Amino acid sequence: MKTAADTVLSPLMAADPGAPMITHYDQTMPSRIELSVTSTANWAAKIAGLLRDELGIMPGDVVVCDLPAHWLTAGVLLGAWWAGAEISTEDVDDAVVVTTPDRLDDHPADVETLLMTTDPMGRPLAAAGVEVPPGVTDLAEACRIHPDAFVPSGGGALALNGAALADLADTELSGRVLVPGLRRDDVVPVLARVFASGGTAVLVTGADPSDPAVADIAATERTTVTL
C-alpha cells in the first residue's frame, strides 16, 4: 500500500521540487524559515528512518504527535506517514510520543519519547541550550545520521485520528494556506488537512491573527485561504 507521505509528496515533487512547502514566520524573533518540497522531504526521510530503523515503527502503528506551529512539525508529520504510521493527537497506550520539552509532562513517562526542537534553525536541543531529560531522545540529533531519502516498508490504512488521508482532503486547502496564531494546539491536524489536500502552508507564530503584520505576510506569500 502506498504511504500517505508518498501520496502527498509525489505530485508536489513532480510539479516543482523547489517550490515552498512550509514557511514559518516567528514574529517573536523575528525570523522566517522556508523549506522547499525537497528539503521537507529530506527531513521527513530522516525522521522516517529514525522511527522505523531505531524505534521499530511499522505500517499501521500509531505515533502520538503533540507539537506546536513550527516548520519541523511538517517533517515529523510526513516522516511518520512515510514510516506507515497513523498519527494520533491523543495519547495511545505504548505508542511513541513526539513532543516538545514544554509539553513533556503532559505525556506518560514510560513510553518512548522524542523531543522536537523549536529552534528556528532546527538545531538539536543541546546545541540550542535546552537540557535533554534522561530517558528521552533529541529528535533533531538522532535523525541526523539517517539518509535524506527513504524507501518505505509499506503504508498504513489510516493517517490521522482514525481517518484515512482521503478523508482529510478539502479542495479549498489545495493552495497556499495561512495558519496564524499566538499558540496553535491544532497545528498537527491542520497541516495534515493541508497536505492531504495538495496544499502548502505558511505558519505565523508570535502574533495575533488580527495583527497588520499577518496581513502583510499573507500578501507577501500570496496565501489563498486562512485557517
Predicted regions located by residue number:
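AMP-dependent adenylate-forming
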Residues: P11-L35, G135-N161
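Conserved short alpha-helical elements in the N-terminal third of ANL/AMP-binding
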Residues: G79-A83, V187-V202
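ANL superfamily AMP-binding
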Residues: A41-V64, L160-L178
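Conserved ATP-dependent adenylate/AMP-binding module captured primarily in the ANL superfamily
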Residues: E86-P108, M121-V130, L165-R176, D208-L227
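Conserved AMP-binding
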Residues: D66-H70, G181-R184
